[in-house]
Amino acid sequence: MESIYYVMCWACHRKCKHCYEDRFRPYVRGELESVVQEAERNFPRIVANLPARFTYLDQADPHPDGTFPEKTGRIILSGGESLIDPVRERVTYRVVEALRDKYAAQGGVKVVVQTTGDVLTDAIVDDLLARGVWMISVASIDDFHVGLEGPAKQKAFMDKLSAMFERHGMRRSGLSATTRNWHEEPGPVYSFFGATPDSWIGKLWPRGRAWQNGLSKATLEDNFCNRWSGGLNFLRHQWNGSEVSIEPDGAVYPCCIKTKRPIGSLLEDNLIDILESLVGVPAYEAITMGHPERMGLDHGWSEEEFIAQSLTTTPAGTPYQNLCIGCDRFHEQVLGPVLEEARERRRRARALTTPVRPPAVDLAAKDHLCFDACSALPARRSSRCPRTRRKSNGARCSPRPGARPSTSTPGPATRRPTPSSSGPARRSASATA
């Protein structure tokens, strides 16, 4: 996999009006404890169900012989705000450590911690770098974040953080977040970005508070699916360009924008199994190709119908048309059974590969059964008991001390043992009867 965007916890210290998720907000007392406990409870299973190796083959950088280099992927850890108390100590640091340990002997992983930046301190930067974080990405450089309105405030904020980062030996990333290979720089590095009008997220997704506040300026021409953080290439997990989004409850989505239904859960299934179960499913092949308007062709939705379904009305009552709306409606109306079928396929596959533990058998009964089975076989000097794997003495296996004697009648092919110093003459009469 090249990239995963992992939202670890819903808690945030801000409630920005342009945010794409209503659940990113301040929580207090019991509510805060509840969302932190959810993150704590789920992250071990989520990490366990990530790919065994976090690498990908880069088709954009072939070797002279036509083969493709294997490169290390990245996982972006986000919130909410990933560095507030108590999320930082109880969730973020532990997730970073779990990822480091999981991939240490498997080619590694580039860990990016995304933050608003205003909670950063020298001690926190030190803690992150000590745990092997490759990049700290500050994602608040825009007019929507209270206190950072305007170029002057934004510059002062970036200058302050840059000085802090550089005190710890970090350097500023020379590549933007939209550059395909930005994660190939040697770390540790830091970066800044925000929802500015000229950025890749500047028009804002039709989601969350951005939608409720009428802030999304996207039109039908803005295909969020066919770009980074969209669904483009999400099924091609072994190649460059692959990315999915994961939420605190383990839900997996093909894009950061989030489809109306998750494609699976990491609390149930391995990520690669989830993706493989959707390979060849027309709707999800359309998403991975960056053409959501073709999602419904196999279900009677023409491209014209999909585009018509992409028209809606904003909460303020104005017309709005974007392919994300059509995708939402297609998921709601059609894809529920399709996703359930994929889930059932995964369940059946697990049942075939999960070993069944044999029922417990007491030791004496096990020896007795073994002796009975062996006593019905022709004597072979080199044979072994099929249960205990011990060598036969030429006729039958001897039971362990304390085993119940066999009461079976030898078959016609069974040869009676001849007394010898090492043979069954030492057994009791009842054992050889």
Model feature map: region roles:
Residues 12, 16-19, 237, 250, ...:
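Short cysteine clusters
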Residues 372-414, 430:
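Extreme N-terminal, non-catalytic leader segments
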Residues 419:
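Hydrophobic positions on the alpha1 helix immediately C-terminal to the Walker A/P-loop
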Residues 1-110, 122-123, 131:
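Conserved alpha-helical substructure of the radical SAM core
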Residues 7, 76-80, 112-116, 137-139, ...:
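A cross-family glycoside hydrolase active-site/sugar-binding cleft signature
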Residues 166-226, 251, 257-314:
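C-terminal accessory region of radical SAM enzymes
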Residues 22, 263-378:
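Flexible mid-to-C-terminal extensions adjoining Fe-S/redox cofactors in radical SAM and related proteins
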Residues 85-240:
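Conserved AdoMet/S-adenosylmethionine-binding subsite of the radical SAM
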